[in-house]
């Protein structure tokens, strides 16, 4: 589920070729109606849902003084409200899967960031959203863990994705490019490995927090 159907189609083709089954859902999770419809479409296709990975996000950096408040709104909509909408929509199915599904456990993995653990100059609103994800994850974990829905947060350091490319040129030049030039960053497969580890533990084990960093990153 994402707003990039071309990439979803390519990924689905890889999954199909590997013998799996994939469903492509073109949805904007900042629209609650679309988020709820996407979850429902998934349930109808597969007959249920036992794992949710909230990975959508936006990182727009820069000072608070003179900031473009539309950038704040976009980050709050994607990083916070979108995560809330998909989680709320999926929870009934996850609780049902934990009670009666073949695994007898269900999983929510929220992708946060090191910026949800440590605050830096220029990361203020992005960190606000990611600290919020961390707090929400732990609170929800306490709410549903005894019903065998495991809720965990995965906090990556620097990863080679397009996340930084949406920033203004001056932000990229001052904050992002120098970091990338001196750090051997993670690749998306490293984060996928972390997610897979979290959701494949035995039923009696829950990973509440997983912090994955490049070795070079201080």
PLM features: what roles do these ranges have?
Residues 5-6, 27-38, 69:
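The beta1-alpha1 cofactor-binding region of Rossmann-like NAD(H)/NADP(H)-dependent oxidoreductases
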Residues 118, 139-149:
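Active-site-adjacent segment of SDR/Rossmann-fold oxidoreductases
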């Amino acid at each position: 589920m994402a707003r990039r159907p071309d990439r979803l189609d390519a990924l689905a083709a890889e999954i199909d070729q590997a013998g799996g089954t994939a469903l492509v859902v073109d949805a904007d999770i900042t629209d609650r109606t679309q988020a709820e419809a996407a979850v429902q479409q998934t349930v109808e296709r597969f007959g249920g849902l036992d794992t949710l990975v909230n990975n959508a996000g936006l990182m727009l950096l820069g000072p608070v003084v003179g900031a473009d408040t539309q950038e704040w709104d976009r980050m709050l909509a994607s990083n916070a409200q979108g995560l809330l909408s998909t989680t709320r929509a999926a929870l009934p199915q996850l609780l049902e899967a934990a009670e009666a599904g073949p695994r007898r456990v269900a999983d929510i993995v929220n992708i946060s960031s090191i910026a949800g653990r440590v605050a830096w100059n220029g990361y203020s609103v992005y960190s606000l959203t990611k600290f919020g994800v961390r707090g929400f994850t732990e609170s929800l974990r306490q709410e549903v863990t005894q019903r065998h829905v495991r809720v965990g947060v995965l906090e990556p350091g620097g990863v080679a994705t397009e996340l930084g490319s949406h920033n203004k040129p001056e932000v990229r030049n001052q904050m992002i490019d120098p970091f990338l030039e001196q750090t051997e960053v993670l690749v998306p497969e490293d984060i996928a490995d972390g997610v897979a580890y979290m959701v494949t533990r035995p039923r009696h084990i829950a990973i509440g927090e997983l912090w994955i960093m490049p070795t070079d990153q201080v």
